[in-house]
Amino acid sequence: MRADLAVSYGEERLPRYTSYPTAPHFSPVIDAGTYARWLSELPAGASASLYLHVPFCREMCWYCGCHTQIVRRDDLIAAYQRTLRSEIALVAETIGRRIKVEHIHFGGGTPTIMAPEAFAELMAAMRQAFFVLPSAEIAVEIDPRTLTADMVEAMRLSGVNRASLGVQSFDPIVQRAINRIQSFEQTAAVVDMLRHAGIAGINFDLIYGLPHQTVASCLDTVRRSLLLAPDRFSVFGYAHVPDFKKHQRMINQGALPDGPARHDQACAIANALKEAGYVQIGLDHFARPDDSMAVAFEERTLRRNFQGYTTDQGEVLLGFGASAIGHLPQGYVQNEVQIGAYAQSIGASRLATAKGYGLTDDDRLRADIIERIMCEFSADLGDICARHGAEPEAMLKSASRLKPLISDGVVRLDGDRLAVANDSRFLVRSVAAAFDAHLDPGKQLHSRAV
């Protein structure tokens, strides 16, 4: 990507578009009653994906942007697990039938902070409440520093078949600056343990733009990671938002790479992974050519949801736990963020919905366009608009932010078909943002575009 474009567009604060509209536009107008009605209206034959949020960690990583908190007492974790089980039963009862489940994802926080038997009980509760297909993908986010052999065995017995390992960086200087000391040897031992247990799908999460990070240290992390041969990589740019995440104030802002340096790091990582045979997928994922995500990318069936890129084709995502977000045909719902408020609602047999968003026809049209841009670096506006009963000319007229992108060669427009230039793919969020009718550039709610 041209360095001048990285400077002119890369500093913009834009959504990652894991939803449209994005979470800052959720409103308390959508409440527990709305969610209950939406659940009861799910069409017969609908299948779902499940997301379970476990908002606990043993220590705080200073770069973290997730909803989590430090916990020392195991009884608090056990109580939260019981609340999750109650919420699962409550949602299933509200739906009124045992719907099919094709994907389950445990996120956090650190989901593997639960006791192994508690994890197994939670999986059993889901299988009782829903019909989890034998082919379902069951994925768990893992902190390699705290994973135990007993938890791996519980995961194996529960049918887990994919694990996402937080790596971020193997550079000890960077690790000290973000309060996450994690050796290569620790990570390698966990990968070996998982594979020995038959959990074959291995993802690594890497981050660029961290304090004291350089192109050389990023490439060294990639080199070491490749020795462990994960199936997928997620490569994110660090989002420094200390006004929203107070613990990020522990990071020395003066040690953060500037925009051009972030661009160089992102390009270096991408080039190294592609040279190693991985397929670049969308904004921030890389996968082996035979991986299901690479196949979905090639077949143009890739989707995007709150976990990032996914092969999940479902239109229903049920979120469980404090702060969890769900997606239904009618719109989005988000649970109470505070654990106490969440537990109080579920304890009273009430859905814990705090806010959400009801989709309009225009939202659905724009969401489809944005998702295709984010997943394929292109969009056939004529085809998408026809499916929604809209005119592509009107949509293009409303996308005034496209004009400079076209002038700068970031985007090519051939009739109604839009495509992001190959050397500008890191700016795909800027292209998607052209179709975002809710975006307020004056509000610094999101991370840098690069």
From Swiss-Prot:
One of its GO terms (biological process) is protoporphyrinogen IX biosynthetic process. Its cofactor is [4Fe-4S] cluster. It catalyses: coproporphyrinogen III + 2 S-adenosyl-L-methionine = protoporphyrinogen IX + 2 5'-deoxyadenosine + 2 L-methionine + 2 CO2. The lineage of its organism: Bacteria, Pseudomonadati, Pseudomonadota, Alphaproteobacteria, Hyphomicrobiales. [4Fe-4S] cluster binds at residues 57, 61, 64. One of its GO terms (molecular function) is 4 iron, 4 sulfur cluster binding. InterPro entries: Coprogen_oxidase_HemN, Coproporphyrinogen-III_oxidase, Elp3/MiaA/NifB-like_rSAM, rSAM, rSAM_horseshoe. S-adenosyl-L-methionine 1 binds at residues 51, 108, 141, 325. It comes from Bradyrhizobium diazoefficiens (strain JCM 10833 / BCRC 13528 / IAM 13628 / NBRC 14792 / USDA 110). Keywords: 4Fe-4S, Cytoplasm, Iron, Iron-sulfur, Metal-binding, Oxidoreductase, Porphyrin biosynthesis, S-adenosyl-L-methionine. The keyword Cytoplasm applies. One of its GO terms (cellular component) is cytoplasm. Belongs to the anaerobic coproporphyrinogen-III oxidase family. Its EC number is 1.3.98.3. It is found in: Cytoplasm. This is Oxygen-independent coproporphyrinogen III oxidase. Monomer. It is an enzyme of class 1 (oxidoreductase).
